[in-house]
């Protein structure tokens, strides 16, 4: 199996293709990307027959920015007979996956696929039973075994394959299902909530998103991101010349500072989180974020980089490389991750966590 399907936001297929070609090439897994505009997915076809499996095992999924999900697949199954779609699919998967832990019957995230998605949900139940009978799936769901993927690109037309549960997205179609909280002041709140789900393991939330932490929200108005911090019982400095939602001010947890987010300098030394969703050139935002991290003004940050119209992968890569270079120059170890989230539009969301200082005598445990 030499093909890898990568699901992405429709309209960002070229960026997804450029990224997987670049990062696979760095690992000497060579191939080419098949791209169809606004399809919501890319197929990376490796030149060597087993390199699809090698790619999804060895390249960390968390290092990808534009892919929501990925899985290795075989040849396209076409013209599935309406009276029996199951038998050909089971036949394709036998000998490829044994005792898989979960089945996901998916489509690309496009308007055209909405009707097909309804079919996929109905089709999952009988297909799961048949795959269990054939030994392709285990008799119970388990996160310790590979995920079996059946990816429909049209009625009667699908790819079959698998991903590794320790190196994929845990979400169906790579999309966390989040509900907009009615009391939140703007829909942007879902970006930060999704970022927490994507970047922070669930078993670390109590420690890293803890009650009583101090946080800063740069460019906070009207308070969509501040809302997520307040919901987790943090104390928040919300920095913006624009007004904050009164409902947030009434909590008593928010201090509104009428300042420019680029000029604000914190006075506290125990700020755990800084978040930022400002509409500004990505290079300017990256420089500000690097300044906060280098100076130790926060332990972790989540921020958005707005994307230009062209060369979007190159621009994001350049901005992330700049932040990494600044951290390296000042002897700071950090984890950097970036992802175009489901709730992002022409932007990507970045998470940086300071780990420890590489220089003796420096402490990050403020």
UniProtKB/Swiss-Prot annotation:
GO terms for biological process: methylation; rRNA processing. It is found in: Cytoplasm. Coiled coil: none annotated. The keyword Iron does not apply. One of its GO terms (cellular component) is cytoplasm. Keywords: Cytoplasm, Methyltransferase, rRNA processing, S-adenosyl-L-methionine, Transferase. Its EC number is 2.1.1.186. It catalyses: cytidine(2498) in 23S rRNA + S-adenosyl-L-methionine = 2'-O-methylcytidine(2498) in 23S rRNA + S-adenosyl-L-homocysteine + H(+). The active site is at 306 (proton acceptor). It comes from the Bacteria. One of its GO terms (molecular function) is S-adenosylmethionine-dependent methyltransferase activity. Pfam families: FtsJ, RlmM_FDX, RLMM_N. Its main location: cytoplasm. S-adenosyl-L-methionine binds at residues 188, 221-224, 240, 260, 277. HAMAP family: 23SrRNA_methyltr_M. Catalyzes the 2'-O-methylation at nucleotide C2498 in 23S rRNA. Monomer. Belongs to the class I-like SAM-binding methyltransferase superfamily. RNA methyltransferase RlmE family. RlmM subfamily. This is Ribosomal RNA large subunit methyltransferase M.
């Amino acid at each position: 199996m030499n093909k890898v399907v990568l699901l992405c936001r429709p309209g960002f297929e070229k960026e997804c293709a450029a990224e997987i070609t670049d990062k696979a090439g760095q690992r000497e897994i060579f191939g080419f990307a098949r791209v169809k505009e606004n399809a919501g997915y890319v197929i990376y076809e490796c030149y060597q027959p087993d390199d699809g499996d090698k790619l999804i095992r060895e390249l960390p999924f968390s290092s990808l920015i534009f892919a929501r999900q990925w899985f290795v697949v075989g040849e396209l199954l076409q013209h599935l007979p309406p009276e029996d779609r199951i038998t050909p699919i089971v036949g394709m998967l036998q000998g490829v996956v044994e005792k898989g832990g979960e089945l996901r019957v998916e489509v690309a995230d496009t308007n055209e696929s909405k009707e097909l998605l309804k079919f996929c949900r109905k089709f999952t139940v009988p297909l799961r039973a048949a795959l269990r009978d054939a030994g392709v799936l285990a008799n119970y769901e388990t996160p310790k075994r590979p995920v079996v993927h059946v990816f429909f690109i049209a009625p009667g037309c699908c790819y079959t394959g698998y991903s590794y549960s320790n190196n994929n997205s845990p979400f169906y179609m790579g999309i966390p299902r989040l509900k907009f909280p009615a009391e939140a002041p703007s829909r942007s709140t879902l970006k930060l909530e999704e970022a927490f789900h994507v970047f922070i393991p669930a078993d670390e939330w109590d420690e890293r998103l803890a009650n009583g932490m101090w946080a800063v929200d740069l460019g906070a108005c009207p308070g969509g991101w501040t809302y997520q911090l307040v919901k987790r019982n943090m104390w928040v400095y919300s920095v913006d010349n624009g007004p904050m939602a009164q409902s947030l001010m009434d909590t008593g947890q928010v201090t509104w500072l009428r300042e420019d987010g680029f000029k604000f300098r914190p006075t506290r030394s125990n700020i755990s989180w800084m978040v930022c969703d400002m509409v500004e050139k990505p290079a300017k935002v990256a420089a500000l974020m690097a300044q906060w991290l280098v100076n130790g003004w926060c332990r972790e940050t989540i921020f958005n980089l707005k994307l230009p119209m062209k060369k979007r992968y190159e621009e994001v890569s350049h901005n992330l490389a700049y932040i990494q270079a600044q951290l390296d120059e000042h002897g700071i170890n950090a984890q950097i991750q970036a992802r175009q989230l489901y709730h992002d539009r022409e932007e990507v969301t970045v998470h940086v966590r300071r780990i420890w200082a590489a220089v003796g005598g420096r402490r990050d445990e403020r």
